[in-house]
Amino acid sequence: MRPVIIHTDGACSGNPGPGGWGAILKFGDTEKELKGGEAHTTNNRMELLAAISALEALTRPCTVDLYTDSQYVKNGIGSWIHNWKRNGWKTADKKPVKNVDLWQRLDAALKSHEVRWHWVKGHAGHDENERADQLARDGLTKHRLKSRIG
């Protein structure tokens, strides 16, 4: 399987509010930047969409090292998702999982790949994390303008 390194980030102005996500994919000497956003969303949804969009962009099975500064994503995928799935996508106190649509999409995106998850401290000088943050802010800016116009 092809090795890929992914760095992701999400951003939101207000929570909820306009938001953006960004991802950098590196494979060999090739690098690809992805970004997007929504007019009305949350930071956690943007963090999830960054990881989902990056994984869905891969066209064949890969071994992935995915770096995120989101404890929500890291804990969700590393600890919580297994119980959610076993409990029919309900939390331990029987409430529906927040952002279940995105967690299910992330779960599906993982099936083709071997993914190792890494947490990095945000805004701490990690070059790729800073670049992913800028892409997320670019996506946010585009959708902040849309929410003001539309």
UniProtKB/Swiss-Prot annotation:
| Catalytic activities | Endonucleolytic cleavage to 5'-phosphomonoester
Limits of the RNase H type-1 domain:
1-141
Per UniProt, Mg(2+) 1 binds at 9, 47, 69
**Gene3D superfamilies, per this entry?**
Ribonuclease H-like superfamily/Ribonuclease H (3.30.420.10)
Tell me the GO BP annotations in alphabetical order. Answer: DNA replication, removal of RNA primer
Recite the UniProt keywords alphabetically: Cytoplasm, Endonuclease, Hydrolase, Magnesium, Metal-binding, Nuclease
Q: Which Pfam families match?
A: RNase_H
For this protein, what does the record note about how its cofactor is bound? Binds 1 Mg(2+) ion per subunit. May bind a second metal ion at a regulatory site, or after substrate binding.
Q: Where does Mg(2+) 2 bind?
A: 9, 133
Cofactors: Mg(2+)
Query: What PROSITE patterns does this protein map onto?
Result: RNASE_H_1
Assembly behavior: Monomer.
Write out the similarity annotation.
Answer: Belongs to the RNase H family.
Per the entry, what this protein does is: Endonuclease that specifically degrades the RNA of RNA-DNA hybrids.
Listed PANTHER family: RIBONUCLEASE H1
* Stated name of the protein: Ribonuclease H
